[in-house]
Structure formats: structure tokens, C-alpha cells
Amino acid sequence: MRIAVLSRNPNLYSTRRLKEAGEARGHTVDIIDTLHCYMDITMSRPAVRYHGEELPYYDAVIPRIGASITFYGTAVVRQFEMMGTFCVNESVAISRSRDKLRSLQLLSRKGVGLPRTGFANRPDKIKDLIKNVGGAPLVIKLLEGTQGIGVVLADTNKTAESILEAFMGLNANILVQEYIKEAGGADIRCFVVGNKVVAAMKRQGAEGEFRSNLHRGGSATLVRLSKEERATAVNAAKVMGLNVCGVDILQSNNGPVVMEVNSSPGLEGIENATNKDVAALVMEFIEANAKPNNTKTRGKG
């Protein structure tokens, strides 16, 4: 098979591993810089051009699109969908996952466990917003944040008010969530491939840090999931329409709650923590599912 990995950096661990895993299984794997792709969208025969030439037909495309290029990246994926190429994650699903509020609304509507969550831009009654989600301690997030940036823990209602007032000054959209104290600064990253959790790790925040992101000095270890945690991760992936994703779960007194569904999960942390060849499992999924026009939206989304 001929497979394209859409990635801005061929040296990233995840990109390298996908290429290695594909080639080890006898496939041709090209790494394509998403932003260097360009298209004539009025052509009767859809195509993607790159470095002055039309790209060949690919049996599958693996989008590795960073949050900062979501708009253009999903347009490129959509063009491949219009060409009939199988895309591991569809453009509509990627766009959906990048909108944190929309994601939480969809998950809530389908009954997926979530922390109590409020959403605001410029609330005229800050105290009521805080009260509505159960009061401090609270986690306050900028909607556009990634890797733990723009995430603050407010220990008291007064602190929460001050943080919200500061964030409002940025003219930003804000999420306010209950703090799951019993999670102890840890979360579980479930790596889902084709409606199955293929690997899972527990990420523990550094001492004194409530955020468990590995980019912020957290550590990761292999974890055994309960049936409920496994089902929650798979259900969240289905609701979001993602074939390959990372589902971040907190262990609360009321059962597992989903914090985020990541459409471009990194491989380094999960492979190192679990000693599993996750990249090869992604390739297995492609081999079983990559058929022409096997994309639900077919670029119409």
C-alpha cells in the first residue's frame, strides 16, 4: 500500500514511528508537509499538489495535524477525502475534536461521564457561574489552550473570581470545571484504534503540579483499565467519530470522567510506558479498512 503521513516535521517521534512501522510491513510511506500542499478546488478531478507536482494516489492518509494549523490541515484532509482516499481520521471529526466546547456538548448529550463544567465568555454574574459548577476548588481553562497551557487551579471562590476576571480581560472563551481531587493529579491516557483501547498509561503530574501533561514534567506508567474505563474511552471515540485518538480520563468517585479526546495523540509516551508497538497497530487498522471512498463524509463535511 501507499500511505501518506501529513506532518510538519519528519523528525518527530510519532511521525518517524509511523513511517518505520509502515515500511516494516512492506508499505511505501511518504511524509507530506501539510502546509506545503496546495489545491485547485475548482477542478472536475480533485487533486493535491506538492513541490510543483500532483501527488500520486494514496491508499491511506494519516493526518498528524497540530492545533495551530487545524483550519488549513482539515481542508487538505477534506481534499484527499474528495479524491476517494481513506483518511484514518476524517476532517469533520478532527475539526470537531479541536472545538473543546463542542466536544464536551456532544459527549454530554450521549451520556459520557464528564466533570461538572461551565462555559462563559463575559459572564455578568461571576459568582453565579462559580456556584453553578459546585464552587471551589475549580479548574479554569482557556478554551484554546493545549498541553496544559492556560489551565489554572483555583483553591477558593475568591481566587476563582480573580482568575475569571483576568481571563475575561483577554476576551477569551473560558471553561470552568470541578476539580476531581480524588484523581490525585493523575489521569489515564487511553489510546484507541478502531473502537478498541490498544494501550493505556497513567500520567502523574510532577510534585506540586495538578496538570499531568508529560510536556510539563509528568511521568507515565503502564495501567490496567477497568471495564468501565475501557468502555468510556471507546464510547468517547465513537461519539467523536475518531478511528485513532487519545482519550484522557480521570478516576472520580462517580466513575471515570472524560477530560479530552485528542485526534492527534503522540506515540512516544504511550509506547515507552507500555512497551507496545502502537504504530504497528495503527498500520494494522489501515490494512483492514483502507478502501477507496471508505470515508463517511467523502469530503462533504
UniProtKB/Swiss-Prot annotation:
It is an enzyme of class 6 (ligase). Belongs to the RimK family. GO terms for biological process: protein modification process; SOS response; translation. Its cofactor is Mg(2+); Mn(2+). Mg(2+) 2 binds at residues 260, 262. GO terms for cellular component: cytoplasm. Keywords: ATP-binding, Ligase, Magnesium, Manganese, Metal-binding, Nucleotide-binding, Protein biosynthesis. Mg(2+) 1 binds at residues 248, 260. Binds 2 magnesium or manganese ions per subunit. PROSITE patterns: ATP_GRASP (PS50975). Mn(2+) 1 binds at residues 248, 260. Residues 104-287 form the ATP-grasp domain. It comes from the Bacteria. Mn(2+) 2 binds at residues 260, 262. One of its GO terms (molecular function) is metal ion binding. The gene is rimK. This is Probable alpha-L-glutamate ligase. HAMAP family: RimK (MF_01552). The keyword Nucleotide-binding applies. Its EC number is 6.3.2.-. The keyword Nucleotide-binding applies. Gene3D superfamilies: 3.40.50.20, ATP-grasp fold, A domain, ATP-grasp fold, B domain. ATP binds at residues 141, 178-179, 187, 211-213.
